[in-house]
Design a protein with these regions (language model features):
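Short amphipathic alpha-helix that is part of the acyltransferase structural core
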Residues: 1-27
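Conserved beta-strand in the GNAT
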Residues: 42, 48-56, 61-63, 68
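Accessory recognition modules or surfaces
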Residues: 38-40, 80, 87, 131-137
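Conserved active-site alpha-helix within GNAT-family acetyltransferase domains
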Residues: 91-127, 133
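Conserved acetyl-CoA-binding loop-helix of GNAT-fold acetyltransferases
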Residues: 69, 75-89
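Short alpha-helical
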Residues: 8-11, 59, 108-112
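Active-site rim helix/loop that mediates acceptor-substrate recognition in acyltransferases
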Residues: 17-44
């Protein structure tokens, strides 16, 4: 398995989302989002992208989005490797004496995957519930 940084393209992105039943966004919106990502990881096997993850943020607050592994390749450590690479990126970008916060929205049923890697379900002792608003046109 090869892991490539910052090479994720529109076609690979859409194919991976479709492989897990996620709806794709418009090409224009997706290409802009990929360009504006701080960091992307693509897992490649036999010249085929089988997993991905993206990081967005501002240098203090980060959000992990689009962690996807094709179903046939799940339970092989690919998602863990992608997540670890993203966390390492944030760690290396955090200055000495600084602090960074990483958020994500786990797919239902995948919460324990993230909990086992140090993420906490919110609300907890320091945070209220996470929220989101979707705008459709």
């Amino acid at each position: 398995m090869n892991y490539k940084e910052n090479t994720l393209c529109y076609e690979e992105y859409c194919k991976l989302r479709e492989s897990v039943g996620w709806i794709n966004f418009s090409r224009t919106q997706t290409e802009k989002s990929l360009q504006n990502s701080l960091y992307t990881v693509a897992a490649e096997e036999d010249n085929q992208v089988v997993g991905m993850g993206r990081l967005i943020g501002d240098g203090m607050y980060y959000m992990i989005v689009d962690i996807v592994v094709q179903p046939a390749y799940q339970q092989m450590g690919i998602g863990s490797k992608i997540l670890n690479m993203i966390i390492e990126y944030v760690d290396s970008a955090t200055p000495d004496g600084g602090r960074s916060s990483i958020q994500l929205i786990a797919e239902k049923g995948k919460e324990t995957f993230y909990e086992s890697r140090g993420f906490k379900i919110i609300p907890h002792e320091f945070c209220g519930s996470g929220m989101r608003k979707v705008i459709r046109k």
